[in-house]
Amino acid sequence: MADQAPFDTDVNTLTRFVMEEGRKARGTGELTQLLNSLCTAVKAISSAVRKAGIAHLYGIAGSTNVTGDQVKKLDVLSNDLVMNMLKSSFATCVLVSEEDKHAIIVEPEKRGKYVVCFDPLDGSSNIDCLVSVGTIFGIYRKKSTDEPSEKDALQPGRNLVAAGYALYGSATMLVLAMDCGVNCFMLDPAIGEFILVDKDVKIKKKGKIYSLNEGYARDFDPAVTEYIQRKKFPPDNSAPYGARYVGSMVADVHRTLVYGGIFLYPANKKSPNGKLRLLYECNPMAYVMEKAGGMATTGKEAVLDVIPTDIHQRAPVILGSPDDVLEFLKVYEKHSAQ
């Protein structure tokens, strides 16, 4: 043990990992620039989330601090951080955020070839009770040669170049999915870098946990009601599934990825088109799941096949372990045929 160094002198950071992947693909390095800038925003948000109580960032947009500056709510602050960092990466041309009604077109002198759709602080409505929150992102290549516009963001999830999320939990983790698979990076606060901790992550074929908001049970489709009953009272007398629901999509999906099982936010009578947003919630998570060997469906088609018509379009989503999602689809198709 005496000859063991206290530090790993050859750590694989996210920057190094993306540079290596870019080199294999003979890329221009633009995606590396983009992800580096995104990482900086994530580190800043992570710091802000941890300091929120002390810095009075909880739900007080409009108040002023001791120097007379406007104090921003965490989600507004997070949005500004991601926007500014992505613009300054010189790799983006169109930015779509949950916080902005219209797409943001990057100034000509800062433009690059990528379109980024993101939710800067998913689950922020839960932050007052210290529930884990996160940042979700999806990166597309601009397809047209025209001037950048909102239309450039209206691409199906199949066109994603990279997607993922940052989870601000007991530690800060960044999960990145690209063609090479899904990789997890943990923020080491000692050196301020994301370190590769889980390589080529694969989800279990079948899990033991289901996750959805059962408070909406009254409005569920019969197919969803039947599927949940099967999880609670399995027809073959096997052990029932455990129920876990945080209400923060990043936390619920990350647990599903790590432990296996199924996450559902289906359409219901109140929200016939689903509630989660396709471009910056459903698509990135569906991409992560598929790259990890899982599945993601709306019930009618794969989430990644949905062609968006609006940047804030909603979609139902059922994702997770392939066997669990297939079982849901079997029940869903049975009810659709009736």
Swiss-Prot record:
Pfam families: FBPase, FBPase_C. Binds 3 Mg(2+) ions per subunit. The modification Phosphotyrosine is found at residues 216, 245, 265. The keyword Repeat does not apply. Keywords: Acetylation, Allosteric enzyme, Carbohydrate metabolism, Disease variant, Gluconeogenesis, Hydrolase, Magnesium, Metal-binding, Phosphoprotein. One of its GO terms (molecular function) is identical protein binding. The modification N6-succinyllysine is found at residue 151. AMP binds at residues 18-22, 28-32, 113-114, 141. The modification N-acetylalanine is found at residue 2. It catalyses: beta-D-fructose 1,6-bisphosphate + H2O = beta-D-fructose 6-phosphate + phosphate. GO terms for biological process: cellular hyperosmotic salinity response; cellular hypotonic salinity response; cellular response to cAMP; cellular response to insulin stimulus; cellular response to magnesium ion; cellular response to phorbol 13-acetate 12-myristate; cellular response to raffinose; cellular response to xenobiotic stimulus. Mg(2+) 3 binds at residues 119, 122, 281. Disulfide bonds: none annotated. Changing residue 70 to E: Increased affinity towards Ca(2+) and Mg(2+). Changing residue 119 to A: Reduced activity. Its EC number is 3.1.3.11. Its cofactor is Mg(2+). HAMAP family: FBPase_class1. Homotetramer. This is Fructose-1,6-bisphosphatase 1. It comes from Homo sapiens. The lineage of its organism: Eukaryota, Metazoa, Chordata, Craniata, Vertebrata.
